[in-house]
Curated annotation (Swiss-Prot):
Disulfide bridge map: none
HAMAP family: TATA_bind_prot_arch (MF_00408)
One matching Pfam family: TBP
GO aspect biological process, one term: DNA-templated transcription initiation
Entry protein name: TATA-box-binding protein B
Lineage top rank: taxon: Archaea
Alphabetical UniProt keywords: DNA-binding, Plasmid, Repeat, Transcription, Transcription regulation
Species whose genome carries this gene: Halobacterium salinarum (strain ATCC 700922 / JCM 11081 / NRC-1) (Halobacterium halobium)
Family of the protein in this entry: Belongs to the TBP family.
Amino acid sequence: MSTLADTIHIENVVASSDLGQELALDQLSTDLPGAEYNPEDFPGVVYRLQEPKSATLIFRSGKVVCTGAKSVDDVHEALGIVFGDIRELGIDVTSNPPIEVQNIVSSASLEQSLNLNAIAIGLGLEQIEYEPEQFPGLVYRLDDPDVVVLLFGSGKLVITGGQNPDEAEQALAHVQDRLTELGLLD
């Protein structure tokens, strides 16, 4: 039997790390195959990997941000590859720079249509924003876990702000429980 938790899919994981030294981005972008650097448009080097599919932003300060990965494991694998590629250029990268997950964006479904007006009234104005003229989704800010859930009339949800994949499951369970309490879910 499938559960609503089975509808959760990680769409994007963003993580950061630090190489611990300043980098010459002009040289780095020349030496890293496929790297892009247009300082007039963006202050960092964009280094894309096909496997795992991701983009790593490398800044002069040595800070790096990996985005586009579909799992926390993929982020670690991607940054491991990036660190290895940078080491091969003769740049000293510590063996295991700490990697910190900043944001996980997940999608999920309640598998039924939602009356967002009724939900906005039921949940109260303290934790929600709903202005359908501005944005078609209802923004629901949770405290535990500390995430934001976007609810759409289709029953689809986007859960963002988490730093652990389990937080999406906790958020979905919370939303399901609250809407059931309010009599707004079948």
